[in-house]
Structures are given as structure tokens and as C-alpha cells.
Amino acid sequence: MLIRTPHITARSSLDYSKAGGLFCCHLRRPPKQIATNIMIHWNGSTEQARANAFAMPLLHLAERVTVLTVIDGQDVPGPSADQVRKQLRYNGIAAELVSIEREGHSTGEAVLAAARAEGCDLLIKGAFTRNRLRQTIFGGATSYIMQHAEVPLFMAH
């Protein structure tokens, strides 16, 4: 599913269950190139693993792939970033690992800052790891990233 819009929010009516993956980019700033420098925001979740699986054709095209972890971020029990890198290598994709500190920022802010710093042209993100009630009350990385990303997003739930 391709969405070109200035803003998509957590409360929008997108049905993630019907899409293999969801690609979003800003209507006002369409990318000149895409999927040459991809960042995967790894948090150990099933949603992130699905996003990676759906994005595999794009990952094969990339010149550079970075697996990002946020220390003290919103991780859940699951495979480590190193295990993800090994799985990517098994599929013929070279990837580097980057870990960052939140440094007083939210996980979403830290992820977008890292994507900017690495010059990424696509961010792969598992969408809405937290349940809907927690997401509504406390917010989350997905909502923040969807509202503030300047880089195209590829997401799956």
C-alpha cells in the first residue's frame, strides 16, 4: 500500500492488517531516491520482524543497510540486533549495527535523529508494538515518527 500524505497519525483509519507493508512519504517533499540507504529500527518486536520480512526486496536493492537499536528505548523481548544482522547476511544483505542513547529524548525523536545523521532515505519500522490503549494514553515511537518523519517510512503491524 502506498500513502503519500503530509501527516498520518496513529488514529488514522489505515487498516494495517490488509497491507503487507505500508510505504509513506511526504506529499510536499517526495524523495529523489529511495531505498539506497535503509535504516531498520530494531526493537525486538514481532511487528518489526514483519516489517523486515515485507521489506526484503527493498533491502536487497540497498547500497547500505543499518540496524539501529535505541538503548533504554521501547524494546520488547525478541531477537537481538546481532541476530537480525546474521539473518540479513544469510539472505545476502550486508548490514551494520548502530546503537544510540536516547539522551533525554523520546525513542521516536532518537530514531529520527539517527536516520537524519546517517543520511537514510528509508526507515523500516514495526508499527504499534504497544496496545491501542497504551498508545492512546502514553503515545509511542510509531505515532511520533509518523507525525514528524522527513524520511520515507516502510511499516508493518
Question: Which residues make up each language-model segment?
Answer:
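Structural beta-alpha unit
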Residues: 1, 91-123, 127-136, 143, ...
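Intrinsically disordered or low-complexity boundary/linker segments at protein termini
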Residues: 1-62, 66-68, 148-157
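Loop/helix-junction capping segments adjacent to catalytic residues or to phosphate/diphosphate-binding pockets
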Residues: 6, 32, 46-49, 74-78, ...
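Short, solvent-exposed coil/turn elements at secondary-structure transition points
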Residues: 29, 71, 101-103
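Redox- and metal-dependent alpha/beta enzyme cores, enriched for Fe-S-associated oxidoreductases
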Residues: 44-98
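Charged helix-capping and loop-helix junction motifs
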Residues: 9-11, 80-82, 111-113, 137-142
